Amino acid sequence: AELVEDIKNQGKEIGVEVEGVKVNFPQVIAHKNAISKQLTSGVAGLLKLNKVKKVDGEAAFVGEKRIRVTKPDGSAEEMTADAIIVATGSVNAVPPIPGIRENPNCIDSTGALSLEKLPESMVVIGGGVIGLELACAYAAFGTRITVVEAMDHMLPMLDGDLTKIGVAHM
């Protein structure tokens, strides 16, 4: 998306005029998927190289330095460590908006990164970092974007000065 934006906006400054820049959106998604697969396998290789043990399952604390992991097959394993880091990633928040769960056109950020067709228009609910990243990327591809934010300014979780800088670069 950034490359398309650069070609459209900055090319003229350096004497490059390009007519009819076209985005092949299915190819963009295929490229994104290939990179994602490469990164995932790279992480697996790093874990193996560094002799990191990976255990699939759900953890529960059973002591100050002890957890019990229930594996997908139902078996359990207890582990002890001097430090336990909870780094489980994030889950998309689904706000209490009437009809949101029943609407097939309502997608989360993961779904937005997996669309097969570039939409002509898009409403992004939430003016936080992820919402604005998606809004800017899709706008660069040519989608008409509207961002809905409940707070009185975009990027409400950031410091006011950072918010001004971020919004100025949109």
For every predicted segment, state its role:
Residues 135-140, 146:
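Gly/Ala-rich phosphate-binding loop of Rossmann-like dinucleotide-binding domains
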Residues 1-118, 146, 151-155, 160-169:
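Glycine-rich flavin
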Residues 122:
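Conserved class I S-adenosyl-L-methionine
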Residues 131-132:
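N-terminal Rossmann-fold NAD(P) dinucleotide-binding loop
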Residues 125-128:
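Glycine-rich Rossmann-fold phosphate-binding loop(s) that bind the pyrophosphate
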